[in-house]
């Protein structure tokens, strides 16, 4: 059995985007190569595309710098957005009432894996 490391990960915590919106963007790039994923995210209209692209680029950089993996062979094997803490704010309403505004945060994790050149 080989002891070589073939994967690297990156996590962005407390990102001010709702997990549901982040998952919409993550579903676009899961299973794609890093270069293809970054190209998709660059032109994706969703606001969550920017933080997800940062995490993908960071995971690729971790793979290259920490483990010496070739960036051209990297594929996004895992990507998920978990819920972070929710900030609660009050919005004043009519007749002395107050409504709760929930500002949700997410923890975005991306794992990239090195695959053989011929494998798809």
From Swiss-Prot:
GO cellular component term of the entry, any: cytosolic large ribosomal subunit
Keyword annotations of the record: Ribonucleoprotein, Ribosomal protein, RNA-binding, rRNA-binding
Example GO biological process: translation
MF annotations from Gene Ontology: rRNA binding; structural constituent of ribosome
Gene3D superfamilies per UniProt: Ribosomal protein L22/L17
Spans traversing the lipid bilayer: none
Similarity remark: Belongs to the universal ribosomal protein uL22 family.
Assembly mode: Part of the 50S ribosomal subunit.
Protein task: This protein binds specifically to 23S rRNA; its binding is stimulated by other ribosomal proteins, e.g. L4, L17, and L20. It is important during the early stages of 50S assembly. It makes multiple contacts with different domains of the 23S rRNA in the assembled 50S subunit and ribosome.
Protein name as annotated: Large ribosomal subunit protein uL22
């Amino acid at each position: 059995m080989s002891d070589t490391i073939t994967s690297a990960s990156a996590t962005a915590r407390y990102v001010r985007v709702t997990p549901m919106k982040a998952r919409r963007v993550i579903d676009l790039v899961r299973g794609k190569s890093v270069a293809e994923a970054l190209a998709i995210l660059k032109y994706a209209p969703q606001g969550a595309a920017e933080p997800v692209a940062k995490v993908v680029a960071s995971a690729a950089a971790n793979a290259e710098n920490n483990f010496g993996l070739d960036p051209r062979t990297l594929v996004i094997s895992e990507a998920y957005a978990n819920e972070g803490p929710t900030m609660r704010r009050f919005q004043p309403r009519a007749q002395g009432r107050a409504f709760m505004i929930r500002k949700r945060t997410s923890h975005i994790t991306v794992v990239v894996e090195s695959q053989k050149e011929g494998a798809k």
